């Protein structure tokens, strides 16, 4: 058992759900010779020190079998879980992680997650004196994103904590036509999270709230509970994840170009 003077351990959980409306079996889609979930794990592993534990949390034995062939740590979780956060909490409980340990949630469909971003975010969280939860924000760079509900916006307060998240444009510029709204006033949310285990348990043990259900944003549950969410700001948007067949083709091309450049 760790003594109170020892630093908290850092763990990364990569949720990987087999079912997907647009891309069934998405974690196992081949990306330049490897399953996507393997690509994500390799990117995370390359970004972080060996002292950081990394495990994939899935709901399907096919994903388990694929990862075991690559000797990648994997845990089966309840297929009825509604979110990756729930999978993170189950893994943390089953593996007996301490209440002050840091759990980082990296999405399983982000094979191009920038390693410097991930490394800097984890260091930011590890250096924090005290926090329940943290996430990432980047500048919003396209006017079309203001009204795109798939691009989540957020407002950050003076202490570096999230005030609110929304699929709508926040803030709303009352005195300007929309084509004159300054993009510099907006931040875009990136779905990478970190939690203290104690906060993760509290969050997943609390039923969803109306704000969360209306926006379909689970982080609104933390806002509703009054849990502070620290925001790590990164200077540029990361590459988009994989949600469609077009995304698959784009990522394959990027990986091919990157591999050609190294050869």
Swiss-Prot record:
* Catalytic activity field: 3-deoxy-alpha-D-manno-oct-2-ulosonate + CTP = CMP-3-deoxy-beta-D-manno-octulosonate + diphosphate
Looking at the UniProt record for this protein, which Gene Ontology cellular component terms does it annotate, in alphabetical order?
cytosol
Location in the cell reads:
Cytoplasm
Q: Which InterPro entries match?
A: Cytidylyl_trans, KdsB, Nucleotide-diphossugar_trans
Q: Name one Pfam family in it.
A: CTP_transf_3
Q: Which PANTHER family match?
A: 3-DEOXY-MANNO-OCTULOSONATE CYTIDYLYLTRANSFERASE (PTHR42866), 3-DEOXY-MANNO-OCTULOSONATE CYTIDYLYLTRANSFERASE, MITOCHONDRIAL (PTHR42866:SF2)
**How is this protein named in the record?**
3-deoxy-manno-octulosonate cytidylyltransferase 2
Q: Which organism is it from?
A: Paraburkholderia phytofirmans (strain DSM 17436 / LMG 22146 / PsJN)
